[in-house]
Amino acid sequence: HLLYAYCAERGVPHRRCGKLIVAASEAQRATLQQIRTKAAANGVDDLRWLDRAAVHALEPEVACVAALHSPSTGIIDSHALMLAYQGDAEDRGAMIAFHAPVTSGRITDDGIELEVAGHDPMRLCAQSVVNSAGLHAPAVAHAIEGLTPELIPTAYFAKGNYYTLSGARPFSHLVYPVPEQAGLGIHVTIDLGGQVRFGPDVEWIDAIDYDVDPGRAAGFYDAIRQYYPGLRDGAIEPGYAGIRPKIGPQGAQAADFVIQGPRDHGVAGLVNLFAIESPGLTAAQVLAQEVASALGHPVSRAA
């Protein structure tokens, strides 16, 4: 609700298209019920249970035995959102330094001293540092002298590939299968222009690589046809890839967001953000509230 209100206020393009989480087999019904129960415990009270006929009425191309319908789920112009956030920060006096990587740092009596590289290298002394470096957050934390290494999680990379659908859009809702261990499963995403993509899958990698392997298409067809049997051969092609900033290895239970503040590591003014994968963008404003609270700033927690 915070995000929708912000988008309406700032004119960020978005649309509440709704989402279906589908059980492709009877064995997955119990998992759907677990999702519903967990959602209710987290304050999500608008999920509706749909039987096969109700799903068919909403999305005739979707095959399943049951589904959860989330009417409040939507899509957004993520680039416009980030520009809006940047504009808000700069309006409040922030200076954004692009291509300025932090190479090292150390804890001092006066705060945190950072060595910053790039076009204009500098030494920066700060009272507060928020390490929100995504894939590189553990590496940045390790580069700060004085921070206990044992408190820094190991970084693991789980690549997520997307394939693009050619032809007419067969869905009006986002369609998600029952989640798998390391991700949300290969699901249907729709952008504001109507382009349909399927993904992401899970590909564990040792080094950062954003190329999409065309050879992964067979696995995509198999996964998508579990809930979209009408997908024709040759209808999808490689799109793009992202990489999840995991802090557990392949086979481990997925970790929740880690917001590590002074109470956790004992360094005043430092907050580390680890494992901020999807839905980190959706939760950005609430994450910011948590960071501010960890730094001792008063926070107004509007709903």
Name every feature range the model reports, one short phrase each.
Residues 16, 51-52, 98-100, 238-240:
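Short loop/edge segments at beta-strand edges and connector loops
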Residues 47, 93-95, 270:
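Short, conserved active-site loop motifs that form the nucleotide-linked donor/cofactor pocket
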Residues 27-31, 58-65, 106-113, 248-254, ...:
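A short, glycine/Asx- and small/polar-enriched loop/turn
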Residues 1-54, 58, 64, 185:
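Dinucleotide-binding Rossmann-like beta1-alpha1 core, especially the glycine-rich loop
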Residues 254-303:
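C-terminal lid/capping helical subdomain adjacent to the catalytic/cofactor pocket in oxidative enzymes
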Residues 68-128, 285:
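Helical element adjacent to the flavin cofactor pocket in flavoenzyme catalytic cores
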Residues 3, 29-35, 52, 82, ...:
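A general structural signal for well-ordered alpha-helical segments in protein cores
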Residues 10-14, 123-128, 132-266:
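Active-site substrate-recognition segment that forms the wall
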